[in-house]
């Protein structure tokens, strides 16, 4: 392996091969253990987009919650799935299919268009210009505000969908979809998550669809792979310790270095990670 590749693989804890059944059980047990160690928590809250990551995470949450109810006899354990469209969601049918697959205890829909537009309006009233890219980040952060509000009303924790193939590049909004209390997919790459969904009997179109962030109005269907400048196949191969082309490796390592700040808490005077790049 390349020197930096070895460091990244170790940080992300990606295995070269997985047993999907074992990883499903590992994630469920992790979610249950967090609740057991924090008995004041009774709810998991997750935003559902209809993509692979939230579909898998939501299914694991519901399975963990059902086991907690069965094992403890406590019916207050709940999984709340939240759909968070900005106006009309183009792939709303996929989000509905994900909900049908997960069978959450509660399925909520909160449209974030009004608060996002209000935020843009009051900021631009000061003379600032909010770009479409910036507005996309506002959407992501507003979605997390909603999830934490719901969690706060239900003795809950917010679940994140971050995984190795996303974490290495910081391909999420800082304090937006990158904010959460617990991330059960951390250690998995994209193909491994897909294998777990197959094992769980997920409808094929939910894990075969091209991943998109769907934050920018100017480029609503921009594929992740285009935004990243590298394919998920190359990313997965790299994270599993395999050889990839020099071009792909350099792009992956460039993304890793550029996004280092996203993998840390706010910088303090005692930190020096930002000086290493």
UniProtKB/Swiss-Prot annotation:
Binding residues annotated for ATP, in chain numbering: 47-54, 161, 190, 212
Classification via InterPro entries: NAD/GMP_synthase, NAD_synthase, NH(3)-dep_NAD(+)_synth, Rossmann-like_a/b/a_fold
Assigned GO CC terms: cytoplasm
Residues engaged in binding Mg(2+): 53, 166
UniProt xrefs under SUPFAM superfamilies: Adenine nucleotide alpha hydrolases-like
Catalysed reaction equations from the record: deamido-NAD(+) + NH4(+) + ATP = AMP + diphosphate + NAD(+) + H(+)
Binding-site list for deamido-NAD(+): 141, 174, 181, 261-262
Pathways involved: Cofactor biosynthesis; NAD(+) biosynthesis; NAD(+) from deamido-NAD(+) (ammonia route): step 1/1
Disulfide partners: none
Enzyme class (EC, first level): ligase
EC id: 6.3.1.5
Gene3D superfamilies per the UniProt record, alphabetical: HUPs
Record bears the keyword NAD: yes
GO molecular function list: ATP binding; glutaminase activity; metal ion binding; NAD+ synthase (glutamine-hydrolyzing) activity; NAD+ synthase activity
Record has NAD as a keyword: yes
Keywords noted in UniProt: ATP-binding, Ligase, Magnesium, Metal-binding, NAD, Nucleotide-binding
Residues spanning the membrane: none
A GO biological-process term: NAD biosynthetic process
Function: Catalyzes the ATP-dependent amidation of deamido-NAD to form NAD. Uses ammonia as a nitrogen source.
Quaternary organization: Homodimer.
Similarity comment: Belongs to the NAD synthetase family.
Protein name (Swiss-Prot/TrEMBL): NH(3)-dependent NAD(+) synthetase
UniProt source species: Lactobacillus johnsonii (strain CNCM I-12250 / La1 / NCC 533)
